[in-house]
Structure formats: C-alpha cells, structure tokens
Amino acid sequence: MTVVILLGASGAGKTTIAETIASRHADTVEVFHFDRIGVPTLAEMIADYGSPEAWQRAKTFDWIFRLSAAARRGRHILFEGQTRFSSVSEAALAAGLLDHVAILVDCDDETRCGRLSIDRKQPELADRHMMDWARFLRTEATSGGHEILDTSAQSVDASARHVCRHFA
C-alpha cells in the first residue's frame, strides 16, 4: 500500500489536511501524527540525544520503521510531521520502505503567521525561527525533487483531495 508523508513547518496545514483525510477515509487510510509521541523540552532533547536535530532524526527513524510495519497490513498510510526530507529518505532506506512519497505542505510567511497567530492562537510560533525552518524545508524539497503543495490560497478540501490522489 502507499505511504504518503506530509512534511512542513508549523502553520502550513499538514495536520488539518491529515485530520480531514482521517475523517473522510478512515476505512482505507490510516493516519499518524509525528507529534503524538510527545515532544520533550529542549533541555531533554539535548540531554538524551545531544541536540534537537538528533532527537528529530532518531524519532523520524522510529516513525518510519513503524509506518513500514503498518503499510504491510494492507492499508494506505498518511503521516504528517516536522522533520527533514533527508532524515525521511535515510530512514525509509533503512526500513525498506521503498513505496512512499514525501510532500512538502507549505504556505507563504504571511499566511503562516496568520494561521499561527490568529487561527491557532500561538503567536510565539510565528517567529523568525519558524520562517527559517520553512525556508530550509522548501529548499530541501526543491533540491530533492519533492512535490510541494502550497496551501496559501487553497482550501482544505482541495488540499486533501490533492493528497488523496496518491492513494488512487
């Protein structure tokens, strides 16, 4: 079965898209969210893994191995989270997860700031670090030839339909 991985910075719409697909296609698509494992404090990440990047990479490997096992059960898999495309690629190779597609869910900075500050009431996330992270992921997706789904002016329904075409 197909494994679709939605990556992106906060506010891009990946969780909203995943939740929409989960509610409409629960019989055929199993949805997983990276953050549901719990995100430790920065101090805990450093103490346990050496850096936030190392924590993220280790958890990406854990997730990809879990997704690989879930895909063998015969259902389509949708996973969303914030991690590097390079970590997903390395983990997929190690897990033998060859049939997957990684998509960047993205939006412009103005839309991201509005979603984080107004819609989610988390203005502290709409900072330069998040915009830099979004730019990093955009560059990584482009250089790796990954699909980019720009949700800036696209409805949630249209975005969900776009992702679901990978399950057809």
For every predicted segment, state its role.
Residues 55-97:
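Glycine-rich phosphate-binding loop used to anchor ATP phosphates in small-molecule kinases
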Residues 19-65:
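Conserved substrate/cofactor phosphate-moiety recognition/catalytic segment
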Residues 6:
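Hydrophobic anchor at the beta1->P-loop junction of P-loop NTPases
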Residues 121-162:
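Small-molecule kinase domains that catalyze NTP-dependent phosphoryl transfer to phosphate-bearing small molecules
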Residues 15:
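Walker A/P-loop
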Residues 9:
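P-loop (Walker A) phosphate-binding loop of NTP-binding proteins
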Residues 96-117:
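Conserved phosphate-donor/acceptor-positioning beta-strand/loop module used by diverse small-molecule
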